[in-house]
Amino acid sequence: MNNNKVIKKVTVVGAGFVGSTTAYTLMLSGLISEIVLIDINAKKADGEVMDLNHGMPFVRPVEIYRGDYKDCAGSDIVIITAGANQKEGETRIDLVKRNTEVFKNIINEIVKYNNDCILLVVTNPVDILTYVTYKLSGFPKNKVIGSGTVLDTARFRYLLSEHVKVDARNVHAYIIGEHGDTEVAAWSLANIAGIPMDRYCDECHQCEEQISRNKIYESVKNAAYEIIRNKGATYYAVALAVRRIVEAIVRNENSILTVSSLLEGQYGLSDVCLSVPTIVGVNGIEEILNVPFNDEEIQLLRKSGNTLKEIIKTLDI
């Protein structure tokens, strides 16, 4: 797509597992000319920056340095990964009050130096914190984006691809709603080469067993809990998901991604941030699509949204 705006500078707030890995994926991408890493632990950020810079001879030129909030000035995109970590057995919603308080300071500091960037929220619970960011920042709704279910959708497509033995990039399926326990698998639209998933399984003769919708859905929904149980945190795949969103913005691709953003009547939901198929380009949210999900999926999506709205009511924002 034509892109009259050149995006050069990205700031990452938070130099933990997700933030530093995100900086790494952006460094490898060749998309950005300047990456700033901000963290309350300056020593940790310095170490990450040093480690990244030692790989500079292997990538396209990019300036990477540890900064302060004043370095948000001039940033085209500010990615927020900072916040309390999710503990084993803790749901993303359990995190909300702790991270809302953290965000009050972060958003205030960002907008003090930059009120014209795109804010990309990654910290969990991402949908609620995307809404919190929208409210606290005063930014236009198209400039506040959550990573949403981009990762969940990738997990869904990967698991389906493993089952049917097809390249994951050729599996078309979405996880919508909350990035968390009430997320919805949109089976009605899942397809390979335009062939509905169930029909494809009947015709391809590659599947070793009949596809179990519930098994795959539960694997997607519980993936983060299993990874945290095994290694303590998730960061590789989510960093790649963030890179994909940044890529869509930088290249003005008008890509369709399941990012989280403010709904205003779509699917019968308002005043809540949720993930549905959305066109993402240089302006951030270009358009929220009206996708023909079936009635059950719409009802589950509304239930997901209303669950989050009840939690939002308890927050001091």
Curated annotation (Swiss-Prot):
Beta-D-fructose 1,6-bisphosphate binds at R157, H172. The active site is at H179 (proton acceptor). Belongs to the LDH/MDH superfamily. LDH family. Catalyzes the conversion of lactate to pyruvate. It catalyses: (S)-lactate + NAD(+) = pyruvate + NADH + H(+). PANTHER family: L-2-HYDROXYCARBOXYLATE DEHYDROGENASE (NAD(P)(+)) (PTHR43128), L-LACTATE DEHYDROGENASE (PTHR43128:SF16). Keywords: Allosteric enzyme, Cytoplasm, NAD, Oxidoreductase, Phosphoprotein. Allosterically activated by fructose 1,6-bisphosphate (FBP). The gene is ldh. Pathway: Fermentation; pyruvate fermentation to lactate; (S)-lactate from pyruvate: step 1/1. It is an enzyme of class 1 (oxidoreductase). This is L-lactate dehydrogenase. InterPro entries: L-lactate/malate_DH, L-lactate_DH, L-lactate_DH_AS, Lactate/malate_DH_C, Lactate/malate_DH_N, Lactate_DH/Glyco_Ohase_4_C, NAD(P)-bd_dom_sf. NAD(+) binds at V18, D39, K44, Y69, G83, A84, V122, T123, N124, S147. Gene3D superfamilies: Lactate dehydrogenase/glycoside hydrolase, family 4, C-terminal, NAD(P)-binding Rossmann-like Domain. It comes from the Bacteria. Homotetramer. Substrate binds at Q86, R92, N124, P125, V126, D127, D152, T153, A154, R155, T234. GO terms for molecular function: L-lactate dehydrogenase activity. The lineage of its organism: Bacteria, Bacillati, Bacillota, Clostridia, Eubacteriales. GO terms for cellular component: cytoplasm. It is found in: Cytoplasm.
